[in-house]
Amino acid sequence: MLGIRVIPCLDVTDGRVVKGTNFVNLKDAGDPVEVAKQYNSDGADELVFLDITATHERRDTTVDLVRRTAEKVFIPLTVGGGIRTTEDIRNLLNAGADKVSLNSSAVKDPSIIKKASDKFGIQCIVVAIDAKKTGEHKWNVFVHGGRIDTGIDAVLWAKKAAAFGAGEILLTSMDKDGTKDGYDSELLKAISSSVVIPVIASGGAGKVEHFSKACEYGASAVLAASLFHYKELTIKEVKEHLKSKNIPVRQIRAEFAINN
């Protein structure tokens, strides 16, 4: 089994990292380049960089900010927000992104998933799903930063995205986002059991035990934002906890250097 990835998420708007609860009440959490540099040093396996208002405001993700971030970090960087065409994807990859995250544009036109994976490789294409519970064992897909209910069933959409060529799913529970009371186990199990591609769990991490629970529910990677931004937990603490539960993790680079 491959090591579970521990991934901080940088939600960015107006050039600043922000964090809120249930996708609203955003608070400033720092400069994205400086925050990314710190996570790189702290042993994060990857970074997710989401311009959370780019699609809603119909503006492009700031390629310059991506370039400046990529120059300072040496771990895989996934970038999303306002990506509508394969040319947008090319520009971000050329700026230093390793992967791109498609959300609203993929829901509007699923063929962009196939076009992108054919052109750039399946390993570059992440489909982000923002899901909210709408009934018993049912979740709908929301787009435009969680503002619009598409009426699309999240499990069916995950299957479709995988069939079109998504390399992995970034699954965010809107109900759990920012609450710190744990990942949405029911949603995570429903999605991870319906696809064969990796699923990144997002939304709700509040204590170290939540990360191991997400792995039990089928997550291939665990993502958090405010916990890490506000130093309530460190990457190292999460990895040590996972190891204590016999869940394989990737070594922090300092440990790797010592052991070699």
Swiss-Prot record:
Physiological role: IGPS catalyzes the conversion of PRFAR and glutamine to IGP, AICAR and glutamate. The HisF subunit catalyzes the cyclization activity that produces IGP and AICAR from PRFAR using the ammonia provided by the HisH subunit.
InterPro entries, alphabetized: Aldolase_TIM, His_biosynth, HisF, IGPS_HisA/HisF, RibuloseP-bd_barrel
Family as reported in the entry's similarity comment: Belongs to the HisA/HisF family.
UniProt source species: Endomicrobium trichonymphae
Assembly: Heterodimer of HisH and HisF.
Membrane-spanning parts: none
Pathway(s) where this gene product acts: Amino-acid biosynthesis; L-histidine biosynthesis; L-histidine from 5-phospho-alpha-D-ribose 1-diphosphate: step 5/9
Endpoints of the signal sequence: none
Keyword Transcription regulation: no
Native organism taxonomy: Bacteria, Pseudomonadati, Elusimicrobiota, Endomicrobiia, Endomicrobiales
Keyword tags: Amino-acid biosynthesis, Cytoplasm, Histidine biosynthesis, Lyase
Active site: D11, D130
Catalyzed reaction equations: 5-[(5-phospho-1-deoxy-D-ribulos-1-ylimino)methylamino]-1-(5-phospho-beta-D-ribosyl)imidazole-4-carboxamide + L-glutamine = D-erythro-1-(imidazol-4-yl)glycerol 3-phosphate + 5-amino-1-(5-phospho-beta-D-ribosyl)imidazole-4-carboxamide + L-glutamate + H(+)
Name of the protein described by the UniProt record: Imidazole glycerol phosphate synthase subunit HisF
Localization: Cytoplasm
